[in-house]
């Protein structure tokens, strides 16, 4: 998906404000912050709760009670006792030593999503950070000051230590912010905005970096965009059904609502019915049966006809395939939204309770569902590529010319070449194995089972991006299938809107031309949600 850049020094007036309270952050709100530059604030209740948690925590420390990461070393070095007089040095050293991420930087929208996820986890009020820490992260988001976060370095337990350390570095005036996609020293950026670096107190370095906010913030964006991608797949599937004069029968409500009531299947079937409503090209199954009966010759025991009562799976199993994707996304969304509103560092502090030394930083729940999302999105891409092949292969396309060539086949190749990147990307998607079972012990075997959750989220993002190109080729081919069959006039309102949206971007393929630009153009439009908007402008409310 296309990444978004937020201008420094300004807050978007178009996106609804987001209040961080540790309880109600959802994927839509993360996207408003990450992509839309929504104004951010921490609720007064969360600030008060943070202050109370801090007071409880300081009472514990002042009573001489040992606390991990406050009066001890970190990780495997927990056996080392550290005098409280070293509070700032201990926290600062942790941030510096763990700012060890490598590789490409997260784009600005993804980095903002990660900051938002960390802010909300701390806003839960059990992490014992001062309210000033929460307010500083919210200020960064409002000013468009986005930490430069390398993508590689997290094991997913103890949370996303390395990525989050790069955020914490900017809080203390070290590390880098992004400017135009490039890193700029944080101390310089803070001076330009009249901000002083914060001095970390007991536990604050640990609280900032010890959590699942990398995988959760990125996962929230992937899931939000994944929901859009499944709708985009439904839209182009409907257009292809029209182009090959498919049947409405497989999408009738009884077969889904009554017979097999998986929520995703029901929703995809409903969307296909809405998208095909008003089409003069689709046929009813009852009419097909009549055609078969009329074609039967008396006295023949076996007879070949050109009438297909059912078309191939790729043209009638969309409710089952894309509905399965929907159900996967729904499960993953529920788990990620729970994690967005969780205190996922260690230790945690509760009024009148024992200090909780645990492992809420472990990203296994998120890692599992991001792997599940990768599987589901991979199958979405497979369906799209098989539908594409169906209209390009003259033996399978129900009368359409080979490779949708508008002129002379052989002299012209049509979409023969454009199919290759789609097929290659399917193969690439299939090479991505589960990350959530790839635990490798680290940290002196203290971290002896880890989740690799951020790798799982990055894998899902990779498939999402690959699918954008697969769908782009399918949208182009679907529009050309309408052209070569001269079926535009019979399209449904949604079909015409989809076709028109494609043709507003690229002209008809009447002769071979340089194809890469067409694919990139349509892929970018998919990233902007233009085809969903075109359909919704026809008063179609997609589920």
Model-found features: residue ranges?
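FAD-binding core of FAD-dependent oxidoreductases
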Residues: 68-82, 86-90, 97-122, 150-172, ...
């Amino acid at each position: 998906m296309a990444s978004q850049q937020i201008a420094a020094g300004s807050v978007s007036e178009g996106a609804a404000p987001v209040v961080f309270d540790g309880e109600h952050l959802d994927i839509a709100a993360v996207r408003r912050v990450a992509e839309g530059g929504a104004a951010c604030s921490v609720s007064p209740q969360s600030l008060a709760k943070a202050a109370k948690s801090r007071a409880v925590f300081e009472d514990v420390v002042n009573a001489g009670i040992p606390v991990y990461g406050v009066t001890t070393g970190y990780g495997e070095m927990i056996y080392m006792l550290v005098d409280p007089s070293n509070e700032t040095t201990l926290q600062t050293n942790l941030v510096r030593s763990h700012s060890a991420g490598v590789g490409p930087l997260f784009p600005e929208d993804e980095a903002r999503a990660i900051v938002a996820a960390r802010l909300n986890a701390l806003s839960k009020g059990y992490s014992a950070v001062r309210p000033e820490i929460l307010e500083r992260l919210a200020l960064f988001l409002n000013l468009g000051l986005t930490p430069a976060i390398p993508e590689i370095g997290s094991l997913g337990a103890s949370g996303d230590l390395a990525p989050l350390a790069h955020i914490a570095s900017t809080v203390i005036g070290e590390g880098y912010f992004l400017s135009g996609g490039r890193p700029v020293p944080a101390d310089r950026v803070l001076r330009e905005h009249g901000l002083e670096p914060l001095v970390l107190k007991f536990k604050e370095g640990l609280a900032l970096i010890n959590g699942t906010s990398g995988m959760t913030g990125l996962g929230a964006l992937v899931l939000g965009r994944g929901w859009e991608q499944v709708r985009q797949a439904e839209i182009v599937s409907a257009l292809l059904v029209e182009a090959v004069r498919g049947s409405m029968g497989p999408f009738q409500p009884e077969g889904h609502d009554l017979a097999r009531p998986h929520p995703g299947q029901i929703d995809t079937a409903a969307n296909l019915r809405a998208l095909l409503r008003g089409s003069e090209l689709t046929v009813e199954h009852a009419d097909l049966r009549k055609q078969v009966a009329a074609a039967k010759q008396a006295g023949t025991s076996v007879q070949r006809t050109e009438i297909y009562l059912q078309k191939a799976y790729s043209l009638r199993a969309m409710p089952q395939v894309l509905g399965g994707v929907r159900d996967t996304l729904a499960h993953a969304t529920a788990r990620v939204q729970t994690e967005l509103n969780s205190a996922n560092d260690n230790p945690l502090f509760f009024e009148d309770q024992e200090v909780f030394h645990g492992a809420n930083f472990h990203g296994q729940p998120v890692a599992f569902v991001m792997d599940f999302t990768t599987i589901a999105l991979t199958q979405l891409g497979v369906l799209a590529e098989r539908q594409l092949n169906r209209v390009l292969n003259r033996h399978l396309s129900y009368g359409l010319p080979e490779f949708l060539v508008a002129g002379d086949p052989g002299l012209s190749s049509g979409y023969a070449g454009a199919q290759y990147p789609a097929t290659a990307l399917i193969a690439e998607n299939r090479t991505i194995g589960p990350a959530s079972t790839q635990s490798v012990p680290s940290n002196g075997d203290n971290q002896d089972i880890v989740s690799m959750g951020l790798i799982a989220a990055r894998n899902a993002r990779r498939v999402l991006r690959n699918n954008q190109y697969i769908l782009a080729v399918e949208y182009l081919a679907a529009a050309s299938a309408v052209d070569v069959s001269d079926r535009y006039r019979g399209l449904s309102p949604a079909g015409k809107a989809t076709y028109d949206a494609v043709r507003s971007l690229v002209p008809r393929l009447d002769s071979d031309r340089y194809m890469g630009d067409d694919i990139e153009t349509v892929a970018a439009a998919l990233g902007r949600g233009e085809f969903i908007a075109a359909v919704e402008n026809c008063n179609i409310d997609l589920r």
